[in-house]
Regions:
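Glycine-rich phosphate-binding loop signature in dinucleotide/nucleotide-binding domains
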Residues: 28-34, 120, 176-181
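Conserved alpha/beta-hydrolase "nucleophile elbow" surrounding the catalytic nucleophile
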Residues: 40-45
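Conserved alpha/beta-hydrolase "acid-adjacent" motif
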Residues: 133-139
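Hydrophobic, aromatic-rich cap/lid helix
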Residues: 91-113, 131
Length: 181
């Protein structure tokens, strides 16, 4: 069974903070009785990694795409500055309000999972686009810190691997999933 979660819907009626989002995400994951395989891109990867750290016995495997394990504070601040100048319509395509995205990013600045990465023992696939300069270094480092991980780079791909290289991503995912069944 496969479930796709809407992060924006998970925050409806709640404060737009990482803690609120992670709590809602955890509640969704906790509904599953069996071990789960989590796959997340960007913010979804951060949530999946956080959950695997907090619930190592529940996570069978992880796929982290464009992942960070220690938030790049300067990049987040710069990104938030840019967000303030962008029209609200740019955020609607993701289901978020502009103010919520800015608030969420602000609350993520202090996230740092370095001291907890040792809790992740499940197989981990880390994927990053060749041209994703904001996340490639961190993704490679994360792969080196996790004992049961492998790193795959998608050629000619930036941040949104799922839309920029869907076939390449699907092939990498399928090989990984075949190996954990």
């Amino acid at each position: 069974r496969s479930v796709s979660l809407s992060l924006a819907e998970m925050l409806e009626g709640k404060a737009a903070t990482y803690r609120e989002l992670y709590t809602a995400f955890s509640e969704e994951c906790d509904k599953e009785n069996d071990e789960i395989v989590l796959c997340g891109l960007s913010l979804g990867a951060v949530l999946a990694l956080n959950y695997a750290i907090d619930h190592p016995d529940k996570v069978k495997a992880l796929v982290l795409i464009a992942a960070q394990y220690k938030m790049p504070k300067k990049l987040l601040k710069f990104q938030n500055m840019l967000f303030r100048f962008m029209p609200n319509a740019m955020f609607k395509q993701f289901g978020f309000k502009k103010a919520d995205v800015i608030s969420l990013c602000d609350t993520m600045a202090e996230l740092d999972f370095r001291d907890s990465l040792c809790k992740v023992s499940c197989p981990v696939l880390i994927v990053c686009g060749e041209k994703d300069d904001a996340n490639k270094k961190a993704s490679k480092e994360l792969a080196s810190y996790l004992s049961n991980s492998c790193y795959r780079e998608l050629l000619k791909t930036c941040h949104e691997a799922n839309t920029e290289a869907p076939e390449g991503l699907a092939a990498v995912l399928q090989r990984f999933y075949d190996g954990i069944e």
